[in-house]
Every structure is written in structure tokens, then in C-alpha cells.
Amino acid sequence: MRKVCRVTINDQVFSAFRGDLLLEAAHREGVDIPHDCNSGDCGMCRIRVLDGLAIGGEGRRPGTVLACETRIMSDLDLRIDTLPRVQTVSGEISAIRRRGCDVVEVKIEPTDPLMYLPGQFLRVQFRGYPSRCYNPTVPMDDEFPELDDLHLQVRQWDGGRVSPTIGSEIRVGHKVRMKGPFGSAFLRPRSESRLVLVCASTGFAPVWSIAVAAVRENPDREIVLVAGARSLKSLYMVNALCMLARFPKVTIVPVVETPQRVPDVIRVGGVTDHIPQLSAQDSVHVCGPLALVTAVTHIAAEAGAPCYCVPFQSRSGEREALEGGQARAVGRAPEWRGGGQQRARAS
């Protein structure tokens, strides 16, 4: 007979057999662990191991495992973050705005409230099209004054089934269904550590949401934001970066990959070439292409810094299935709503 193990998750206790998958054992006993993909891609079932032995499914951060892939090998004491509940909400597009040569911002009015944490993502389906994953974010200027609506930054991929049709077939009034939130790369509240944010292209969407929430919670928190783009015309988030730059403890590092004549404040080269020296006291968030996420994760690990990441690409490599932020500074701070849960409110 297999050994019976005692498993504690926060304040819930249940029994499981040695060798059981943690996620399956928990759900069998009526203990809820937030999850989505069941394949280790989304990171939503990441859980901290305080005591005991669990094998497999090691998370990117030391001391964490993915419940869908790890097996119980002894008594366990585990902790999991309290997250907004996953729900399905309908809505419709109320505005579309061109943000750059290949980026559009989509404003969605939900029919019911939708709570999420800055940095989480949603599965979004425009009626008649396949679903895609996007990070809800906050507006970058005053063109979209209703901050309780959902805002998506979408890169339009040549040959894509969904993104190229936004603004033509997918227009204002188009019906939308959203499920979420998912993901564990969200801003941890009440932290005093330096916040290092790294992104490329529409990876800026979750990073912008995190940055706004962080400065609203603590305007004196030290933040470094490194934002990359292929060229100057692709650096669509310049106005938002200028908003953040007004805060004295915020350092903005815009980077373009292609060598060209640019203003002195913009760096040229790879994004990782301009990441500040990290330490174990930093908190790092990265969103962008898989190569960038992998590189930043490695740099953070060498420094002993926690790194929360959202690659654009899943392990299957289906680029457009994750074509949003997931794959995946002149400001008026008093108007920003961040810190803790964001709420998309019914109109």
C-alpha cells in the first residue's frame, strides 16, 4: 500500500498518496488550486513549497512548483497566492485606436465586472474568430477616459487570423467574450524592493499596468523600465514612458534594436544589453518574445532575483495564439487606478 501524505495548502489540509499529482489530489479532495492549461505553460498553478518533498514541475523561481506537473513525495506545507476568481464575461468593443505602425489599442466595455491583478491575462474571443490571449492594461493617455473598461494592446501580425482584421472586420460594436484572469506574473503588493520591468513590443501592456499600479501604491518606489522595439517607429509607448519619467524614482530606458539615428535618450541594441545590474533584492518582471524572457530569466536567476515572466510564445510555438501581451513621462498620477486588483466595470 502506498504511503499516505498530509498536504497543507494555506489553511486547508487533505490526504494524498505518495506519487500523486498535486493538482489532481487537491481537486479530488475538494481543495481548489487555480489552474488553466494543465501542461505547465500558463504558470497559474504555481505554488510555494515551505516544507516537504515534491518532485517535478519545478517553477522558474526557487522554492516553487507547478501543481499540474509535480508529484507528492512526503508531507507538504504549501502556500498559494489568493487570486481573483476565473470568470467568463461578455462585452463589446467601444473604441479602436492605432498606436503604432503595427499596434492597435482596443477598448472593451464588459457587461459584468471583471477583476484582475496587474500583469495577469485574459482569453479573449471576438465573435466569429478564434480566441487569443491578451493582457488587460490601462489607457496610455486621456483618449480613453473610462479607466474601468478593459484595454488591450494588440500587435497585428501579417498572415494572422485575428489581429489583422481588427479595425476592418472587427470594429466598434463587435461582440467579445472574455475568460480569466490567468497567470501568476502579477505585481506583488506592499513590496519595498526595486522593481525592474523589461518588455518588448506589446509586452509593454502588462508592464505598463504593473508600473501604474506600483507608482500609485508607492510613488517613491524605485522602478527601472526597459522597453524595447525593433525601430523608432515601433516604439509606440513613448507617451506612456514620458508619463512615468515624471516620477523621481522611476528610470526609463527605451531601446531600439535596429541601428539608426535616434535621440540621445533612446539606446540602440538588444534589450538585455541595457538591463541594470541586478541583485537578490530586486523584483523583476519580463514580457516579450520567448528568447527575451529566457534571457532575462537567466540573468535574474544568476543575481538571485525573483523573476515573473510572461512569454509571447507557448511551448507549442503557436505565435498568434498568444499574439497579445501573453505568449506572453507626463502623468497625472491621482487619476490612475492601480495597486491590488483592477476592476473592469459594467457600463
Spans of features found by a protein language model:
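Residue-level "contact hotspot" at macromolecular interaction interfaces
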Residues: S15, D36, M115, S168-R171, ...
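Ferredoxin-reductase
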Residues: T88-K175, S193, A229-S231, V255-P259
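Iron-sulfur (Fe-S) cluster-binding segments and ferredoxin-like electron-carrier domains
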Residues: V7-T8, F14, E24-P34, G43-R85
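Short conserved beta-strand and strand-loop elements enriched in small hydrophobics
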Residues: R6, L78-I80, L122-R127, H174-G180
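Residue-level marker of beta-strand positions
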Residues: L21, R28, M44, F121, ...
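FNR/FR-type flavoprotein reductase catalytic core
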Residues: L147, D158-S347
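Short, surface-exposed secondary-structure boundary micro-motifs
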Residues: L50, D81-L83, R127, W157, ...
